[in-house]
Design a protein with these regions (language model features):
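Surface-exposed acidic/polar loop and edge beta-strand patches at domain peripheries
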Residues: 1-182, 194-196, 205-245, 250, ...
Length: 346
């Protein structure tokens, strides 16, 4: 049954109390109107529980914003949700349109730092988050007498002539009363030769989920620091700090322990507010995990980032024989869930 306002409801009971379910839960589509965000499409989703999030068909079907009862869950950068026409492939130009948000997808041919592999150049984190979706479909309807289901889906084709033809089908689902949504992704090689394919879910948690009162709660068996600063502060990998101007970023590669169902949940919890957010995923599909921690003023964010390959550049993956290869006609499936943690949730 739909749990709303500390009570369970059937379809008929809610229909009697409102003329349109959008009064309680549903989707609204609109376009941004000015600056580099002009003409970017947003789908705003409300579940009625206080959980609200946005889906951006113009930018990889990613999640540029989410909140719960007015509390933001994610970090948002100074760039805004830049229109994909402004994408800069070279070097670290990707950062000029990196909004952060609750989710920015990285891939599909490469991720990590700029590099050259087999005569092809790749910018930071590749281009899937800048590709507009086709075949976008929004459904919001009663699935049965007790479930008002919300579903948003679309197709993202990363391709070029004489190059890869990789298609990401993404479906995002939630329901009235929910405090989470689920992403079901399928990557298909629609070309005729084997292609390297990688995906990383760059989940960016921000204030007030992230604060000096916050800790990471994750089944981490091992943390490998990336770089000297991360190594020097490794003992505090799971502790958040107050913002400091100009403080360098830190990254840690984690080995996670899956539960009895093969799932991994990593969360950031503000102990003072008894409030937090999490990412949950299937370890078999996404066996690698990177933590991105930056406690700098303005870039005050912690990324929890599951992926299907180690977060190193494509040329390094090839050198280590760790490229994940998708055969012609083959598909891979991934499932990720993002949601809220609060002691008062019912």
């Amino acid at each position: 049954m739909a749990t709303l306002y500390n009570q369970q409801w059937q379809q008929q009971e809610l229909r009697e109390r409102c003329g349109d379910m959008k009064q309680i839960a549903g989707c609204t589509r609109y376009r941004l109107q000015e600056g580099p965000e002009r003409d970017v499409e947003i789908i705003d989703v409300r579940t009625g529980s206080g959980f609200r999030f946005q889906v951006c068909p113009s930018r990889g079907m990613d999640i540029p914003f989410a909140e719960y009862n007015g509390r933001p869950l994610c970090w948002q950068s100074s760039t805004g949700v830049v229109h994909p026409a402004y994408y800069e492939k070279e070097n670290i130009g990707w950062l000029r349109g990196f909004n952060g948000g609750l989710l920015t997808t990285c891939g599909l041919s490469s991720f990590g730092g700029p590099n050259e592999d087999a005569g092809e150049s790749y910018g930071l984190h590749d281009r899937i988050s800048y590709i507009p979706a086709r075949d976008v479909n929004v459904e919001q309807q009663w699935k049965d007498e007790s479930t008002f289901a919300i579903s948003i889906s679309g197709n993202l084709r990363q391709t070029r002539v004489f190059g890869p033809n990789l298609v990401l089908h993404r479906r995002i689902t939630t329901s009235a009363g929910s405090t989470f949504f689920t992403i079901d992704d399928t990557i298909t090689n629609e070309g005729f030769v084997p292609e390297p394919a990688v995906i990383l879910y760059h989940c960016n948690f921000g204030f007030p989920v992230v604060s000096e009162d916050s800790r990471i709660d994750a089944p981490s068996l091992e943390q490998a620091p990336i770089g000297d600063f991360a190594a020097q502060t490794q003992d505090s990998w799971n502790h958040m700090e107050t913002p400091q101007a100009g403080l360098a970023e830190r990254c840690y590669a984690h080995q996670m322990r899956a539960d009895e169902n093969g799932m991994v949940r990593a969360a950031i919890i503000n102990k003072k507010l008894d409030f937090g957010a999490y990412v949950e995923y299937r370890a078999k599909e996404l066996p690698h995990f990177m933590q991105w921690k930056t406690m700098a003023c303005g870039t005050y964010v912690t990324g929890l980032e599951p992926s299907n390959a180690p977060l190193i550049s494509r040329d390094q993956l090839r050198a280590r024989d760790q490229l994940t290869i998708l055969q012609p006609g083959e598909s891979w499936n991934f499932q990720v869930r993002l949601g809220v943690l609060e002691s008062t949730l019912h």
